[in-house]
């Protein structure tokens, strides 16, 4: 099995969890620095997968770092994930024309 095939297999195995998290984060539509439910959800998922999670990073309550160490801990990979919503961009998921969930509400539109 190639490394790419291994990664594809893991993604397929975790597909339901990934899609559920995506849908929940979309529906929460939390503004910057207020992503408490989204952050808690992601931390919970990462912890259940064996990651060590540090919350409140840089004195931001919703910021976190998740670490998963195997062997020597090398190489190191960093990912920055943006999942906050923006004011007035409320939008129904899967819709390609403007169709807000709530007029003037926050969202990922």
PLM feature spans:
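Acidic/His- and Gly-rich active-site-bordering loop/insert found
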Residues: 2-109
